[in-house]
A protein has these predicted regions:
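Active-site-proximal region of nucleotide-activated glycan assembly enzymes
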Residues: 140-194, 198-202
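N-terminal subdomain of nucleotide-sugar transferases
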Residues: 12-62
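Conserved donor-nucleotide binding/catalytic region of nucleotide-linked donor-dependent transferases
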Residues: 331, 336, 344-365
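C-terminal alpha-helical cap of glycosyltransferases
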Residues: 365-383
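Acidic donor-binding loop of glycosyltransferase active sites
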Residues: 283-293
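Catalytic binding pocket for nucleotide-activated donors in carbohydrate/polymer assembly enzymes
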Residues: 297, 301-341
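Conserved N-terminal ligand/cofactor-binding loop architecture of enzyme catalytic domains
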Residues: 40-115, 119
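Donor-nucleotide binding loops and adjacent catalytic segments primarily
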Residues: 207, 213-284
């Protein structure tokens, strides 16, 4: 199958010049990056006069039960049986099997059609590639009016065929290596725009703050491993002189309860459960440890905090590991012993020379204002 036809779309003919221009953002819960990008863009548009943005997870709206099941299955697959997800990623990347599934998405397409007819958007943003195929089909068939379509690509460097072949007027990517990878895969270079990943608008202000003083050097750890592994990491890091550890367990209540009872003094580290203060916690830290998820990696880049990647999902997250290595902004360490040693070398050896080098490299490529700049780019072409 050839690549779907590209080309600029005319401005929406149904826009009301008196009312705010509607921006429709389509997202999904398969991974954090899609939703993060969508929410952050909406947050920016809320403060832009003349625009009104809405975020829709049409998968959930059409069939909430099935969507939740698929999200749980996705999370189990990437965490417990990653070989399954790797095989799935490979099949969709190397074969045209995805295109064969499009006729089965009739309900999803109908829901998008209803929203587009009701809202009459000045522009559409998709943060998940499936929507891009359905949107183009609706526009080309004349079922909905055409308007500019912006696709926010939430992966880096290792870009699946489903993204590369997805039709859009503009592909908005996080960095130059991703733009190069997509162009090499056949995406017209002139439709790729490097604007950075749209992280929370809060990062724009947080990035202006000075680094926290040290020592002690503040390490932020977002674990995604077993209690046994996490316990070893916490014991090892709290034993390092000159290190203060903060652990965020998120929604993993069992892990939170386990760490509260761990045989180390609670005074040696800080413990948080679910929090909406991740931007602030990153800004208050010197180094981050966590999985190579698209959203969190881009947040560490935005705030210029080096990262130790402790877990990688085969497929799309491999690109984030490659990105970090290319930038010289961190390292991969997937065992407790490797994590502890990586922290020791980076922060405590030779006056923290390695950490300082990582940080300097990040400062050259940081995009803390990416959400605002992306929204401004969309707004300018939707006017």
């Amino acid at each position: 199958m050839g690549r779907p036809k590209q080309g600029r779309r005319p401005l929406c003919a149904n826009c009301d010049p008196v009312s705010d221009k509607k921006i429709l953002i389509f997202t999904t819960g398969f991974g954090d990056g899609h939703n993060s990008a969508a929410r952050n863009l909406k947050d920016v548009f809320e403060h832009m006069p003349g625009f009104d943005a809405e975020v829709h997870d049409t998968y959930v709206e059409v069939n909430p039960g099935a969507s939740r099941f698929l999200q749980v299955a996705y999370n189990i697959s990437i965490q417990r049986v990653p070989v399954t997800w790797k095989a799935f990623f490979h099949v969709f990347d190397k074969t045209p099997v995805f295109e064969a599934t499009l006729p089965t998405l009739g309900k999803l397409k109908a829901a998008m059609r209803a929203l587009l007819l009701e809202k009459k958007p000045a522009a559409v943003v998709t943060t998940y590639p499936v929507y891009s195929y359905l949107l183009r089909a609706l526009m080309e068939s004349g079922e909905v009016a055409t308007c500019p379509h912006f696709m926010v690509v939430t992966d880096s460097i290792v870009i699946n065929r489903v993204w590369n072949r997805a039709p859009a007027d503009w592909d908005l990517v996080a960095n130059e290596p991703t733009a190069d990878a997509m162009a090499e895969a056949g995406v017209p270079r002139e439709k790729i725009k490097v604007l950075g990943f749209p992280v929370s608008p809060r990062f724009e202000e947080l990035a202006k703050r000075p680094l926290p003083p040290g020592p002690p050097w503040k390490i932020l750890y977002l674990p995604s491993a077993s209690r046994r592994t996490v316990g070893k990491v916490v014991r090892g890091l709290t034993a390092l002189e000159g290190i203060h550890l903060t652990v965020v367990t998120g929604r993993h209540r069992h892990l939170h309860d386990f760490l509260k009872k761990l045989d180390v003094p609670m005074s040696s580290f800080s413990l948080h459960g679910w929090t909406d203060r991740m931007p602030e916690l990153l800004a208050e830290s010197h180094l981050f440890i966590g999985k190579a998820g698209g959203a969190i990696v881009q947040e560490t880049l935005a705030i210029a905090r080096p990262m130790i990647i402790s877990h990688v999902v085969a497929g799309q997250e491999e690109g984030n590991v490659e990105l970090l290595a290319d930038l010289g902004a961190g390292t991969l360490a997937t065992t407790p012993e490797a994590i502890i040693e990586a922290v020791r070398v980076a922060m405590l050896e030779s006056g923290g020379a390695r950490w300082k080098r990582w940080r300097e490299n990040l400062q050259r490529v940081s995009h803390p204002a990416a959400a605002r700049q992306t929204a401004e780019f969309i707004a300018a072409l939707s006017a």
